[in-house]
Amino acid sequence: MRILGLDLGTKTLGVALSDEMGWTAQGIETIKINEAEGDYGLDRLSELMKDYNVEKIVLGFPKNMNGTIGPRGEASQTFAKLLETAYNVPVVLWDERLTTMAAEKMLIAADVSRQKRKKVIDKMAAVMILQGYLDSLN
């Protein structure tokens, strides 16, 4: 069973995919979206869902440090409902606090240029979200 991991932003959607055994997460791509206009890249997501026979989605759920849900968390909840309706698969909201910061630190430590980091940060965050979920299962 393959699981898709997503990191939702206002302009991009980071995408990661599990291996068939559900042990590791790999970054797939970053999809350009426009949240303000309701464009969430669903056409591309549909292709990925079919190509990889995805049976579950793990969506990053940004909470405030005190555990409350702010505007970005509410946006993720709304997006989760949209995904469940569009694809008829379970969507798990996974606490993503600090994943983008951790991903950026990893890329800096790997001496990745600022320009390249900007292109891959959301995909890396999606990997960290999905890997955290997979680790919790195993």
Curated annotation (Swiss-Prot):
Q: What class of enzyme is it?
A: hydrolase
Q: What is its EC number?
A: 3.1.-.-
Sorted alphabetically, the Gene Ontology cellular component annotations on this record are:
cytosol
Q: Enumerate the UniProt keywords alphabetically.
A: Cytoplasm, Hydrolase, Nuclease, Ribosome biogenesis
Q: Report the superkingdom from the record.
A: Bacteria
Spell out the molecular function terms from Gene Ontology.
nuclease activity
GO terms for biological process?
Answer: rRNA 5'-end processing
Give its localization.
Cytoplasm
Name the family.
Answer: Belongs to the YqgF nuclease family.
Q: Known NCBIfam families for this protein?
A: RNAse_H_YqgF
Describe its function: Could be a nuclease involved in processing of the 5'-end of pre-16S rRNA.
The cross-references to HAMAP family, in alphabetical order and at most eight, read: Nuclease_YqgF
For this entry, the protein name equals Putative pre-16S rRNA nuclease
Highest classification ranks of the organism: Bacteria, Bacillati, Bacillota, Bacilli, Bacillales
